[in-house]
UniProtKB/Swiss-Prot annotation:
Gene (UniProt): rplQ
Statement: the UniProt record of this protein carries the keyword Protein biosynthesis: no
Source organism per UniProt: Beutenbergia cavernae (strain ATCC BAA-8 / DSM 12333 / CCUG 43141 / JCM 11478 / NBRC 16432 / NCIMB 13614 / HKI 0122)
Name this protein carries in UniProt: Large ribosomal subunit protein bL17
Family membership noted in the UniProt record: Belongs to the bacterial ribosomal protein bL17 family.
NCBIfam families: L17
């Protein structure tokens, strides 16, 4: 008997499972978003991402590998001409699984699996920031004596700036503390005068 695949078993036998995943992948590439059970979505994700990776290569051998799973030539054409170019800059994570409410009939946990077609701009900004930080670190390594003195004076100035702020807050706390006992003393005096009457 063949070793079962990792993850939940989806159908009766291995052939049924392969065909079910192939049909799910075909529907995903055709509609770019499908609703299915969580177990099927989790099993579909690695297959779909591997097929998109083949499509990003774009050669004939990759197209034939994809055609062994996805039998619809129109969907394969869409995958290679529209979806793969949209994912060209993305290094992975081509799909997104979002859990939705349970199915009405049998209360099965449902999920939406969709292709992530948004551009990858936030990552590019992070990469640019990281390269700038690397350049700054290289400059500091070249001339470490002068920036250290500047940092020390900046640190002294910041400590001096913080110290008056702490004194101001301490004065406010003391003033509030001074007012509170006086109010309490007046209230006590009124109570004692009421009891004497």
């Amino acid at each position: 008997m063949p070793t079962p695949t990792k993850g939940p078993r989806l159908g009766g036998g291995p052939a049924h499972e392969r065909l079910m995943l192939a049909n799910l992948a075909t529907a995903l590439f055709e509609h770019e978003r499908i609703t299915t059970t969580e177990a099927k979505a989790k099993r579909l994700r690695p297959l779909a991402e591997r097929l998109i990776t083949f499509a990003k290569r774009g050669d004939l051998a990759s197209r034939r590998r994809v055609l062994t799973v996805v039998k619809d030539k129109g969907v394969v054409h869409t995958l290679f001409t529209e979806i793969a170019p949209a994912m060209a800059e993305r290094p992975g994570g081509y799909t997104r699984i979002t859990k939705v409410g349970p199915r009405k009939g049998d209360n099965a946990p449902m999920a939406v699996i969709e292709l992530v077609l948004e551009p990858l701009s936030p990552k590019q900004a992070t990469v640019a920031e990281a390269t700038a930080a690397t350049k700054r670190a290289a400059k500091k390594a070249d001339a470490p004596q002068e920036p250290v003195a500047d940092e020390a004076t900046d640190a002294d100035e910041s400590v001096e700036d913080e110290a008056p702020a702490q004194d101001d807050s301490a004065d406010e706390v003391e003033a509030a503390a001074d007012e509170t006992p006086a109010d309490d003393a007046e209230a006590d005096a009124e109570k004692s005068s009421d009891t004497e009457k």
